[in-house]
Amino acid sequence: MLGNILSAIDLPKGVVNILPVAAAVGEKVMSQAAKGIKDISLELGGKSAIIVCADADIEYACDLIIGGIFTNAGQICSATSRLIVHQDIADALFERLKTKTENLSIGDGFDTDTQMGPLVSEQQLNQVKKYFDIAMTEKLGCLTGGKVLGRAGYFVTPTIYHNVPVTSQLWTEEVFGPVLVSKTFAEDLDAIRLANDSKFALAATIVSADEDAALKMALQIQAGHIWINEQQIVLPQAGWGGFKQSGIGRELGSDGLSAYQKSKHVLLTH
């Protein structure tokens, strides 16, 4: 849609190019920029973690989990698609999360009662279906979902897999759909290790009643943007971007502005 709008105005070809968000695409863009030593910033994909600590309020944690992965049917670069939950509350949390997920209203995105809409295209539907098939091949435990809905449009069920091995493709690869994978942890260091065990490092969420402990954990997590007891809030005054294969450079804030500026120093002796 954006491409059609831009093509309808008097904009020279090549000024705006619309590309899929993927590390492989970023590599090609970087290689082209290298030929002319051009400045570049890249905001690519993610496989962000949401860590739920033992002292977290389960009801609120479930709301953050659902909002972090099922908003826009998971088609958000910063979607928190890896759930890392403390083993002491895991059973209670998964029970409540399953109920709330299965009660989500799925339908037309323009309907105010809809809580999760469709995928954007048949291509993306096939992408998500591919990961459903991989999950079956890998014999992953499916808490809920894992199906294409038999209705007009590109609808799938909101899906949760539990006790997913870190070697699984669903744990390591960006699905870009409403698919959540999960593991449990015993110690904070275990949660941090799991969160950082990714080629991506865009965002993360920490859910805890202890803000000091959450801040301490946040300092050890490799991610460009970390929410504590919140999810998917992006402030224009704060820089946005990630590490590793999630990209280079920053958008928004003073960091984003500096990407479009050049510093110059003039020294005069007299």
Feature map (PLM): residue ranges:
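Short amphipathic alpha-helical segments
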Residues: 1, 29-31, 95-96, 218-219, ...
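PLP-dependent aminotransferase-like
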Residues: 1-21
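Conserved C-terminal structural/oligomerization subdomain of aldehyde/semialdehyde dehydrogenase
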Residues: 11, 51, 105, 148, ...
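ALDH superfamily catalytic-core signature
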Residues: 15, 25-165, 228
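Short beta->alpha linker loops
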Residues: 20-21, 56, 88-89, 186, ...
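Short alpha-helical
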Residues: 23-25, 35, 212-213, 235
